[in-house]
């Protein structure tokens, strides 16, 4: 399977509604991906003269470049992490910033990337940026049992983190964990029968934990939340879409702290979630949450 399988952007209408009446001129999309949100924003807002889109996934950027060809004079794409975007961005640059956190449908559907437990014979990679960093396989084969357990606990909130880590280390003594099937085999005796009967795959939390660790998503999110308020012009808005509590909680707390410091106000007192119609059409959208913060019009 290839990256040509389209990613369906979530909460598009709701994201657009947060910027209507603002006439943004300079916009930043730090997770441009395949360009779904970008296409919608550039179509909806002719006022946007410059749309800076960045992503760590080179294959996604290639798709985005093709998708956004009709807007090529208004788009600037960059291969960059949140940290690298920060080094390239001056304070007070943007009227709006959008972040769509987590893994995309396109990445999940490409079994060769190792994000999904469906591709049994494919390598456990899980890197969003395949040009650098450790793969999930390298993590599982090189870290100590205690370190692996901490990953499963802290980034996956897996209740059986100790047992899962012990099973991984026991398995790798006989055979390296190189593929999705290897990880399944390594943890086959960990989960009780009731976990196996659930609709949610028992390895879901472990896959989440490995993905977050491999891509340093927590550290990257901290950089974003420490920096994005500075990137905004007075009256600018930061919109963040998250898909799990590990991402949503820091966003919620950062917005509350920024409001308490007088940096602006939270526009989404009640978090925005997908409609029933959207979750029916795109089941992967069901856990999405959208929050938005508006920077004060006065310098603080």
From Swiss-Prot:
* Positions of S-adenosyl-L-methionine binding: 35-37, 55, 82, 100, 107
Q: Where in the cell is it found?
A: Cytoplasm
Q: Which Pfam families match?
A: Methyltransf_5
For this chain, one GO molecular function annotation is: rRNA (cytosine-N4-)-methyltransferase activity
Q: Name one GO cellular component term.
A: cytoplasm
Identify the main location: cytoplasm
What is this enzyme's EC?
2.1.1.199
Keyword Cytoplasm found = yes
Note the InterPro entries from the entry.
RsmH, SAM-dep_MeTrfase_MraW_recog, SAM-dependent_MTases_sf
| Keywords linked to the UniProt accession | Cytoplasm, Methyltransferase, rRNA processing, S-adenosyl-L-methionine, Transferase
Query: What's an example Gene Ontology biological process for this entry?
Result: rRNA base methylation
Q: What class of enzyme is it?
A: transferase
The protein's annotated catalytic reaction(s) are:
cytidine(1402) in 16S rRNA + S-adenosyl-L-methionine = N(4)-methylcytidine(1402) in 16S rRNA + S-adenosyl-L-homocysteine + H(+)
Task of the protein:
Specifically methylates the N4 position of cytidine in position 1402 (C1402) of 16S rRNA.
NCBIfam families according to UniProt: 16S rRNA (cytosine(1402)-N(4))-methyltransferase RsmH (TIGR00006)
Per the record, the similarity remark reads: Belongs to the methyltransferase superfamily. RsmH family.
Please give the name of this protein: Ribosomal RNA small subunit methyltransferase H
The species this protein belongs to is Chlamydia trachomatis serovar L2 (strain ATCC VR-902B / DSM 19102 / 434/Bu)
